[in-house]
Amino acid sequence: MLAAEGGHNPIIPEPVEIVVGLVAFLLLLFVLWKYAVPRFEKVYEERSKRIEGGIEKAEAAQAEAQRTLEQYRSQLAEARAEAARIRDDARAEGQQIVEEMRAQAQAESERIVSAGQSALAAQRAQIVAELRADLGRQAVDLAGRVVGESLEDEARRRGTVDRFLDELEAASAPASKA
């Protein structure tokens, strides 16, 4: 059957169809180029500006965040330095308090030792005086018994006893130093 029609090929379009299709394509191309492409360009440009603005805003926000971070870091460093200074001051103050307490304890110790030595010296002097008086009375009583008479003359007796005790003390002092 195809052979009977004679030379018409269904794959190849008719020349009129090619011309109409070409005119319609050119008309569509003109309409798109005149109206649609400028709108697409405008939308594309607005979108590019928004993206660039967003990038600039993001960069500005990042720079602000970096400045804030640096501020926080410097404040943190200042706070650490302040804490270290306070710690050092507290240590120094504690050391000073310890030194003051030591000095007070040393002074109190020296005062107590001095008071004890003074009390001992006073007691020793009192005991020596009491022993001298007692020794003097006993010596007079013994001398009175040996002699057989009473040696009641107080002034003479005291002078003799005191002189004897002084000589005895003087004799024992070099012996105790040696």
From Swiss-Prot:
Pfam families: ATP-synt_B. GO terms for cellular component: plasma membrane; proton-transporting ATP synthase complex. Keywords: ATP synthesis, Cell membrane, CF(0), Hydrogen ion transport, Ion transport, Membrane, Transmembrane, Transmembrane helix, Transport. The keyword Chaperone does not apply. The keyword tRNA processing does not apply. The chain crosses the membrane at residues 11-31. It comes from the Bacteria. It is found in: Cell membrane. InterPro entries: ATP_synth_B-like_membr_sf (IPR028987), ATP_synth_b/b'su_bac/chlpt (IPR002146), ATP_synth_F0_bsu_bac (IPR005864), ATP_synthase_B_chain (IPR050059). SUPFAM superfamilies: F1F0 ATP synthase subunit B, membrane domain. It is a single-pass membrane protein. GO terms for molecular function: proton-transporting ATP synthase activity, rotational mechanism; proton-transporting ATPase activity, rotational mechanism. HAMAP family: ATP_synth_b_bprime. F(1)F(0) ATP synthase produces ATP from ADP in the presence of a proton or sodium gradient. F-type ATPases consist of two structural domains, F(1) containing the extramembraneous catalytic core and F(0) containing the membrane proton channel, linked together by a central stalk and a peripheral stalk. During catalysis, ATP synthesis in the catalytic domain of F(1) is coupled via a rotary mechanism of the central stalk subunits to proton translocation. Component of the F(0) channel, it forms part of the peripheral stalk, linking F(1) to F(0). Belongs to the ATPase B chain family. F-type ATPases have 2 components, F(1) - the catalytic core - and F(0) - the membrane proton channel. F(1) has five subunits: alpha(3), beta(3), gamma(1), delta(1), epsilon(1). F(0) has three main subunits: a(1), b(2) and c(10-14). The alpha and beta chains form an alternating ring which encloses part of the gamma chain. F(1) is attached to F(0) by a central stalk formed by the gamma and epsilon chains, while a peripheral stalk is formed by the delta and b chains. This is ATP synthase subunit b. It comes from Saccharopolyspora erythraea (strain ATCC 11635 / DSM 40517 / JCM 4748 / NBRC 13426 / NCIMB 8594 / NRRL 2338). The gene is atpF.
